[in-house]
Amino acid sequence: MGKRVLVVGGVAGGASAAARVRRLDAEASITVFERGEHVSFSNCSLPYFLSRTVGDAESLVLMTPEGFKASYDIDVRINNEVCAIDRAAKKIRVRNELTGEEYEEAYDELVLSPGSSPIRPRSIEGVFLPHVFTVRNVNDIVKLDKYAGQEGKADVVVIGGGFIGLEVAENLREAGKHV
């Protein structure tokens, strides 16, 4: 049996790294851990769901865990968050977000690609209200779309002038919102 490679994070970087390891080593045992429920989705396409340039949310998902297994013989575990790394013992501790079960996995090589989390400064009043959204994954964009699609929700403020923020503003405008 080949070396045991664990990848923390299953979106763009982690999914690419896992596929690359497979191309370099056909014998490796590769497992990807993703804390969210989707793996390998198109981050850059998320805003285009708001204007229906991307027709449905599932079109944003490029590969499923089953697809990774069938195409690359890579085990992908969604809803599994890596909680701790023991570098000396070469083990990680993982928590299944659905069951709460925790377990350990040993590795020969570990790839870290955990992604990011949006910052919501606690000093800004109202930043955690239910009508304040962040856009990081498929679930986030679906929630924003559902809220923005309600009758009477015509005015939208987008905070963040990076590519995703600008594309969210553009696509909300395309969807008829005042941005």
Task: Provide a role label for each language-model segment.
Residues 9-14, 115, 160-165:
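Conserved phosphate-binding and hydrolysis motifs of nucleotide-dependent enzymes
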Residues 13, 38, 84, 99, ...:
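Glycine-/small-residue-rich active-site loops that bind phosphorylated ligands and cofactors
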Residues 55-56, 121, 162:
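Alpha-helix initiation/capping motif
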Residues 1-6, 66-159, 174, 178:
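FAD-binding core/adjacent interface of flavoenzyme oxidoreductases
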Residues 60-61, 103, 164:
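Residue-level preference for nonpolar/small residues embedded in alpha-helices
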